[in-house]
A protein has these predicted regions:
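Alpha-helix-loop-beta-strand connector modules within alpha/beta enzyme cores
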Residues: 175-186, 232-251, 303-319
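Catalytic-face loop-and-helix region of soluble metabolic enzyme cores
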Residues: 289, 293-334
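Alpha/beta catalytic barrel-like cores
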Residues: 86-226, 315, 327
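Conserved phosphate-binding/catalytic region of the ribokinase-like
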Residues: 1-90
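Internal active-site segments that recognize and position negatively charged phosphoryl groups
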Residues: 225-266, 273-276
């Protein structure tokens, strides 16, 4: 159209007001947001609102290109822009930034878990051998996974759970192969959870390769005494926020130990797992993966419905073995 004599008379769209943390990338972000509307035939008002919102999100975050929003983030921000003056601190927006970019799809994965620490230490002690031999054992187990991948044609469908206490060399050997890799952060058998690494867990995760999935085992029953339950919830919230911030996927291994008898877990046909998952979702804790004990067919259906309702971006469920007989595992998968 005609260019007005005064700039104040030109077409304009106000931008959301945000706390500025970074001065780079706003122009690129504006153009990307503008084009996301223009290429779909939107009018200039919509295009400019999307462009302004994209630019606002980038300057409200640290970094440049990595701060660019996805369409889901942009839609959420536009719907809440009036009250989101500090986008960097909004948990839902940070979660969307974590889960909505394109990620590798795992429709099926066969995982060999050998992140055991206290159990293998005890076996070594019983056998009268030094625990110093355990790192070599874990390297051999990585070789076993590689051989299984080759012989059974499981490329892109195989993985391992490996610790960094006895398995640091094994982790290095497994990383970079395109495997699904989980790495535990909890001190074995700690209840409430104690993180094994020294220092804030958020700082620790910043040094992990992005392909390694943060795995945490948590003993949690919705009927636990309030102090213990709250301690576990606080630790899981801290871990969830740290993993989201560092860009790592999170696997939450949930074991509903019976209150008053932590050596035994609740049966798979009661609702303790479902109630525990619901509680975590209510707290804003949305792990990318769940690791759950075998459940009844009815419970699996309820879990599937719960995940679909509360976290459509969930990566899936890994089923716990817990030394169960093969017949029980087959039934649980069915």
């Amino acid at each position: 159209g005609e260019i007005p004599a005064c700039l104040d008379q030109a077409f304009s769209v106000p931008s959301p007001r945000v706390e500025v943390l970074n001065l780079l990338g706003a122009g690129d972000a504006f153009l990307a947001g503008f084009l996301s509307g223009w290429l779909r035939g939107a009018d200039y008002g919509v295009c400019c609102r999307r462009g302004n919102a994209s630019g606002a999100l980038v300057v409200a975050r640290h970094a440049c290109a990595p701060a660019m929003p996805t369409e889901a983030e942009l839609d959420y921000f536009l719907a809440h822009a009036d009250c989101l003056t500090e986008p960097a601190h909004d948990l839902t927006l940070n979660w969307l930034h974590h889960v909505t970019p394109k990620r590798r799809i795992w429709n099926e994965v066969f995982i060999f878990a050998f992140d055991h620490r206290s159990q293998l230490y005890e076996l070594a002690r019983q056998a009268g051998v030094s625990e110093k031999r355990l790192p070599h054992l874990k390297k051999l187990l990585v070789d076993t996974v590689a051989l299984t991948e080759e012989r059974l044609g499981l490329a892109g469908r195989i993985g391992a759970l490996i610790d960094d206490l006895y398995g640091e060399d094994a982790l290095h050997a497994a990383t970079g192969r395109g495997w699904w890799i989980g790495r535990p952060v909890e001190r074995p058998e700690s209840n409430p959870v104690v993180f094994e690494a020294v220092g804030p867990i958020a700082a620790v995760l910043e040094h992990w390769p992005k392909e390694q999935i943060v795995k945490c085992l948590v003993f949690y029953h919705p009927d636990d005494p309030a102090p213990r339950r709250q301690a576990q919830e606080n630790q899981m919230r801290t871990l969830s926020e740290a993993a989201t911030s560092s860009g790592h996927e999170l696997l939450l291994e949930l074991i509903p130990a019976i209150p008053g008898d932590p050596s035994h877990q609740a049966p798979g046909n009661d609702d303790s797992v479902i109630r525990a998952m619901t509680r975590f979702y209510d707290l804003g804790i949305r792990p990318d993966w769940w690791k759950l004990p075998p459940q009844s067919a009815e419970n699996w259906q309820r879990i599937d419905t719960l995940i679909a309702q509360r976290d459509p971006y969930s990566r899936g469920v890994v089923m716990l073995g817990l030394n169960a007989p093969i017949e029980r595992l087959i039934t649980a998968f069915a």
